[in-house]
Regions:
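Protein-protein interaction/assembly regions in multi-subunit complexes
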Residues: 1-180, 184, 189, 193-199, ...
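Extended C-terminal regions of large enzymes
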Residues: 7-8, 14, 24, 140-516
């Protein structure tokens, strides 16, 4: 039976409650925030909640259904991201539809541990100052290499705005990642070191009709694999594909005939997928175009940021520095891509030498928690607040991807005549929310968005999972309710700059589904 776990770190209580009727996925995450956190609370207040909600299809035999929504209140209304790795499927396989963590642990740092029906809160001394990799190794050494972990590292301990979560992968290399869009300051403020799930199943979520779900899941997999981006360019050439599409929607790179995708020369088992059930594969396949291979998409993003901000460096130096920054950022639990943009601003303002040595020294300042390091760890927004009179600085402050969404011109099919009054941009956002509600990887959006047959399959998969018949229209209507609810939360915050929190990946979708 699916349930919601409510964990209060202040009084160390653990409670359960029923899943609200008709709520699932990202929509459920926002509902839990409203129910269990104090409206108007500050981002780092004990009154805030840290919520993890697997997608409705996560934990089932559905391709690319590997995601969970992570959310909390924020000074800008709310913070929300989508994570993958081995945690979402194992959490769902334990029958946990939502995890709510509130309060603040006052006796050092703690971990929340789940194993079957057992749930515990306990202190984890001796991990302060350790890198994320060392934290993962310590936990897996004690609780087994098959346990799934999300948590915070040194950057989260300092509650830096650029801190992120680390999320483990199944056993292999890489061991973990720090998603760029995640946030580690909220769990860091609760003194929550890690959430640990011990479960030997990835596909243990209850399904009303598992046989039919597996059959329809195979049909969905075929749509994804047959797509030229999801089944060709992404697994073959990696995130360089995304960089091409940002420039031109038709610039889908092709792997030269007879040439195999680049592979890193590493010993031991390699993870090519972030979680079991992924049919795309985005790990250890990302070529820089010059033979250099990135182990994960995040590394390619750091390299792209380096090329944008430090283009005067040689290609070899860009590769070397980007790799070093990415690894160091991962070890700290720091958003290395945003670090590059912020450090570039700081170097210019402080009139420092624009060299790779300067850049590498600044990330060590952040690791030490020095004044310059903490300032850079605050992101471009922190520097922007120091220079409100400088338009050139304000233009470089990172904004949400959909800040100027009203200027976008999309070209989508009218999937459902009953919803003919919905604009194309709203329709795009609703389809993104359907994927997040169901737990589907955003990379599969190239194959699934704007396709009636994909919408029908997703509706059938919902029915197989729950036993309740729904139509594509109902999925879109629920997504619309989720969008409206989030807009209301943002409206309550005077600091909110956008009505909706849409994944950064939407920049690519704007281009791909935009008008010519």
């Amino acid at each position: 039976m699916s349930r919601i776990l409510i964990i209060d770190l202040t009084d160390k209580s653990i409670k359960e409650e029923a899943v609200p009727t008709g709520r699932y996925g990202r929509g459920l995450a926002m509902e839990l925030i409203r129910r269990h956190s104090k409206e108007g609370c500050e981002r780092l207040s004990p009154d805030n909640t840290f919520v993890v909600v697997p997608g409705l299809l996560t934990g089932c035999h559905v391709p690319c259904a590997t995601r969970a929504t992570v959310a909390a209140r924020s000074d800008n209304g709310f913070a929300v991201t989508s994570i993958t790795g081995d945690m979402p499927q194992k959490l769902a396989s334990l029958g946990i539809s939502g995890l709510v963590i509130k309060g603040r642990y006052e006796c050092g740092r703690c971990a929340v541990y789940m194993d079957g029906d057992a749930v515990r809160i306990f202190p984890v001394p001796g991990m302060d100052g350790l890198t994320c990799g060392d934290i993962v190794e310590n936990i897996r050494k004690k609780y087994g290499s098959d346990c799934a972990v999300i948590g915070t590292g040194p950057a989260g301990d300092m509650r830096l705005p650029l801190s992120g979560l680390f999320t483990t992968y199944p056993e292999g290399t890489p061991r973990f990642t720090c998603p760029r869009s995640s946030f580690g300051d909220v769990p860091g403020s609760k003194n929550l070191r890690a959430v640990i799930v011990k479960c030997n199943k990835y596909f243990g979520a209850e399904c009303a009709d598992e046989e039919r779900l597996i059959r329809d899941g195979k049909a969905l997999a075929r749509l994804i694999i047959d797509d030229p981006i999801c089944g060709g360019a992404l697994p073959g050439l990696g995130s360089i594909t995304i960089l091409h599409l940002l420039k031109n929607k038709n610039a889908i790179p092709e792997l030269p005939k007879g040439k195999k995708p680049c592979r890193p020369e590493k010993a031991g088992r390699l993870n090519y997928c972030c979680a079991p059930g992924c049919v795309i594969g985005c790990l250890n396949r990302h070529s820089a175009g010059n033979g250099h291979v990135f182990s994960a998409p995040e590394e390619a993003e750091v390299r792209a940021a380096m090329a944008h901000c430090f283009g005067e460096l040689s290609e070899e130096e860009l590769d070397r520095t980007a790799s070093a920054l990415s690894k160091r950022g991962m070890s700290l639990g720091l958003n290395a891509t945003e670090f590059v943009y912020t450090a570039a601003m700081y170097i210019e303002l402080a009139k420092l030498s624009k060299t790779s040595e300067t850049l590498l020294s600044l990330i060590e300042e952040t690791a030490r928690g020095s004044v310059p390091g903490r300032l850079i760890g605050g992101g471009t927004a922190a520097l922007g607040r120091l220079y409100p009179d400088r338009e050139d600085i304000q233009r470089r402050v990172t904004r949400p991807a959909n800040t100027k969404d009203s200027e976008r011109r999309m070209s989508l099919h009218k999937l459902c005549p009953e919803l003919g009054d919905i604009g194309d941009l709203e329709l795009l956002y609703r389809q993104i929310f359907i994927m997040e509600n169901l737990g589907l990887c955003i990379f599969s959006s190239f194959a699934l968005i704007n396709r009636p047959e994909a919408m029908e399959l997703m509706a059938r998969l919902y029915s197989c999972r729950t036993g309740e018949t729904v139509t594509p229209v109902q999925l879109l209507e629920y997504a619309g309710e989720c969008l409206a609810a989030e807009a209301d939360m943002a409206k309550d915050s005077a600091a909110a700059s956008v009505r909706h929190s849409i994944p950064e990946f939407v920049k690519v979708l704007y281009r791909y589904f935009g008008e010519e």
